Amino acid sequence: QRQMCIRDRYEAGCKVVSSYPGTPSTEITEAVAKYDEVYAEWAPNEKVAMEVALGASIGGARSFCGMKHVGLNVAADPLYTAGYTGVTAGMVIAVADDPGMHSSQNEQDSRHHAIASKTMMIEPSDSGECKEFAKAAFELSEKFDVPVIVRLSTRVSHSQSAVELCEREERENIPYEKNIQKYVMMPGNAIRRHPVVEARMKAIADYAETSPLNKVEMNDTKIGVITSGISYQYAKEALGDKASYLKLGIVNPMPIQIIKDFAAKCEKVYVIEELDDVIETHCKKNGVNVIGKELFSLMGEISQTIVAEKILGEKNEYITFEDNVPVRPPVMCPGCPHRGLFYCLHKLGVMVSGDIGCYTLGATAPLCAMDSTICMGASISGLHGFNKARGAEAEKKSVAVIGDSTFMHSGMTGLVNVAYNSTNSTVIILDNSITGMTGHQQNPTTGKNLKGDPAYAVDLEMLCHSLGIKSVRVVDPYHMAETEAVIKEELAKEEPSVIISRRPCALLKYVKHNPPLKVNKDKCVGCKQCLKIGCPAISIHDGKCVIDHTQCVGCGICKEMCKLGAICD
């Protein structure tokens, strides 16, 4: 689905792509990197990505940026102003919502951003529509002088189907013309642009009444369903020809007359939508009687089973098993460089202000070495606030942890604040040489760009010094005794400090692993000390430690944990 989004951007003559990785949107930009005709990059964060896309549009080239739903929060500043300025060439934004929070810290509904920013939003329901809507998005962006958001969801993003490919349509850049009143958003110009924006949204709403992106399917009229996106697929599978459907492809601004006409033909009308009651509210405020969140939850995903149960009263029968397979919790990979560091933090009993990344798993048992995780970059700012609230004693017993990519995303300003507003905070940057959680994307510290070509690599040590931090130390988290000693030393200092925990991600292809470790059964007493690091390669059988050679990468952390010498090379 995600690759279809970018295939049609390619076919539509898109020239500039700038995104920040975030599940489930990442693969859109990875796919476009294969096309030489399109310039594609990973930006340091979503705000920069959207600004790059807007700049390319002003420069006359069709542009695109992609992100997950919480990334749109980061990009909200340029988005809301772009709603006023409009565009020159078509500008399309893909945002992937995550109902069910499969890989996210919240379940927000991006439709609210489209409403508040007064931009257009369309929502495909399958691969074919992803491709069709992507091309339409550029045309609509240029027709109505507006950024167009394509809303995806986890299930739409993670599905696939056959589609028909077309050739690329090469387009010359639109000639650049200086337009201060349109693009310089000082108050006087913004005041003049606002009526233009309102008139534009009215024109889009009028267009939505007859747009082919909104589709009506009339079957049995006892049940009518108004829906959009993946919810259409659930409804169609559950109800089939027992219901008629109005599938809204344009979800902001929404039409009203087509909704009223559809509802008038049906005895009972249901609104099926995941997350918030956006369509339902639109219907009810315009006098259309619908049934929505009385039946369907504001939380989590909908499914065909839920639709059948709520509307038809049909319950599926399931086979139950006496012995349920235990759920395997997410864990850090064998050889993960973060494991040793988090064990040290757990051992020291410090408060850990956490951040977004693979290392968030440091909060899980048995390490339990993280106290908070809010959003990208919040670890450093949060630690500063924590220490200001609790005073000098807290400074000696608290740290922030943040990944290299996350630090480049939004951690630098927090570190500037620590130096500028003076707390003796200790910040640990987990430098694993990649953006790990979203699938090994390059970032400004890795020395390579999106296409794998050599690029400038930010020197983290020099950067931290330039931001006002005098004490910057580098440790190898595989060496836990040294790492623990450095953490103690930095916590004791009467100044802010940074520790860079540097070791490449164990899953990187170029990383060479050591031979798997072995267990001397005669020395092992079954003390289970080695289990405290939470490595999935280690287990206990018949009272003795066992190492799975198919998983072990020979990192040596468990060997350092075993004081009896039972784990050896």
List PLM regions with ranges:
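Short acidic, glycine/serine/threonine-rich loops at helix termini
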Residues: 28-31, 54, 75-79, 101-108, ...
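Flexible, low-complexity linker and terminal segments
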Residues: 1-3, 12, 124-332, 337-338, ...
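Conserved thiamine diphosphate
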Residues: 98-147, 153, 188, 330, ...
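Thiamine diphosphate
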Residues: 1-3, 7-127, 155, 218-219, 363-500, 510-511, ...
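A glycine-rich helix N-cap at a beta->alpha junction
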Residues: 37-44, 85-96, 178, 420-431, ...
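Short helix-loop-beta junction
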Residues: 31-37, 236-246, 462-468
